[in-house]
Amino acid sequence: MDTLTSSPLVSDLPGIAADILARVRGKSPRVHCLTNAVAQNFTANVLLAAGAVPSMTVAPDEIAQFVARADALLINLGTLDRERRQAATTAVEAATTKQRPWVLDPVFVDRSRQRAEFARRMMSMTPQVLRLNGVEFAAIAQAEPAQDALDRYARDQCCVVALTGATDAVTDGGRKLKIENGAALMGQVTAMGCAGTALVTACLAVEKDSWLAASAALLAFAVAGECAAARARGPGSMAVEILDALAGLDREILLTRARVR
């Protein structure tokens, strides 16, 4: 695993994102995804389009073995049944033992007290990146998703917070940036956010600077979404077009289209 630069400027991000994406394609990192049943197929296809190698088992009795052979781990709480609860804890313990980075996506954490409590237990195991939306942040952090709250939570939890929405925000409590790329049509495709988190995980597998990895992945995914939306006729074709856009994403496209501040 490499680090591109210790003190990048926000303006450097498009080029850095291109370099990290090239490393994903060159190294084909294995990403184990404990994700929700709705998201599995699309998530796997997004990872393949980016150049990573996905695995998806949720079986508690074998997930530790899969994680041990992976380069990074994604924990997505979308379908939080009993088997996935057990598997999530086992998977994170295995990742910690093997010093593999992992990402938490606390989907629908705002919908039930039990889910919020489980997500907070997962946070106590210190993911490298927490990727979520504003409503989910308010539920898990018990604070509104203003920049100062994001920064404070990132510092307190010793992780990167990657907040996605109309504008994405990424902070490690010190460094911060906002990404203004993306397309409304992305929100009309099931599992789009979940798949974006998987791309964060793939980038984290090849880049040990968690803030850079998360920032690069969200920028790449948002730009790919814009390119896909320009060609799509609706949600159905959007789901296909973003795979092609991600597979064809290059440095020139990122440098030309990125809107980062």
Predicted regions and their residues:
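Conserved phosphate/ATP/ADP-binding segment of small-molecule kinases
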Residues: R113-L185
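Short, well-structured alpha-helical segments that form the helix of a local strand-helix-strand
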Residues: A149-A154, S210-G225, I242-L243
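Charged C-terminal helix
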Residues: D12-G15, V223-R261
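Active-site cofactor/substrate anionic-group-binding motifs, chiefly glycine-
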Residues: V46-K98
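Glycine/small-residue-rich loop that forms an oxyanion/phosphate-binding "nest" at active or ligand-binding sites
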Residues: N76, E83-L132
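Short, small-residue alpha-helix embedded
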Residues: A139, Q188-L219
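Hydrophobic beta-strand scaffold residues
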Residues: P54, Q99-V103, V161
